[in-house]
């Protein structure tokens, strides 16, 4: 194979994937952008060919939408933080295990992904409801019942359960690339286990923590099933708000505008977080 032909080969092989991505991602995104600028009439619906900025102005000028944006992002940030705190030690323990226990533990970590998110949401609603298992346990001690369903607590707990595997796997992958002799050398030179973990291990698994946190935050901010089933009608997040605009209010242009603003805000937060962590990672490694 000549050199120019060999240089073109990777592009030729990736062309089907690029076309598929363009058809399934870029085309719908472009149509959503166009829809978000269409004039909406309550009687006839979106007016193709008539464009306006009113939908974006309605979102950025109404405190109601700011409150929902804020709720979405603080819940997503809290879920990401909890997943880091729980998932990083879990990945470390998984990495230190030997066969066959490692395979069993890995199956336990991945098992939630084999069950539908809707089924898991219904399971949590049965646990957290007024007559659920948790309130039943409190009642056995003469306390409660406590309102847990349709609260931020229910949404956070269920999202952590759903998103935790997306944190464990990237961190575990980074730990597998870690040379254990480096940490052992630090211990032999007098460093405490905590110091070796903080100065040697954590900086090297930072890429895994970064990728895991970006996945968890992005999926949490755009999650629909968990907030919809465990948050109820009053505890709205951005995905449930978009759903209401599309299917209840039938205001598709406003729903499209909210979806694009959510996408833009998500990208800003994730790129900012990525930049901050990369700087700390480079600084830690010198």
Spell out what each predicted region is.
Residues 178-182, 281-282:
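Short glycine/proline-centered loop/turn elements that form peptide/ligand docking sites
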Residues 1-7:
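Short, Lys/Arg-rich, polar N-terminal cytosolic tail immediately upstream
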Residues 44-49, 126, 224-250, 286:
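Glycine-rich helix-loop "coupling/hinge" segments at transmembrane-helix boundaries
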Residues 276-286:
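Short cytosolic juxtamembrane segments of multi-pass membrane proteins
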Residues 9-42, 57-176, 200-224, 229-231, ...:
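Membrane-water interface segments at the C-terminal ends of transmembrane alpha-helices
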Residues 144, 191-193:
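Short coil/turn motifs that cap or connect alpha-helices
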Residues 186:
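The alpha-helix within a helix-turn-helix
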Residues 189-190, 203:
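Glycine/proline-centered hinge or cleavage motifs at structural transition points of membrane proteins
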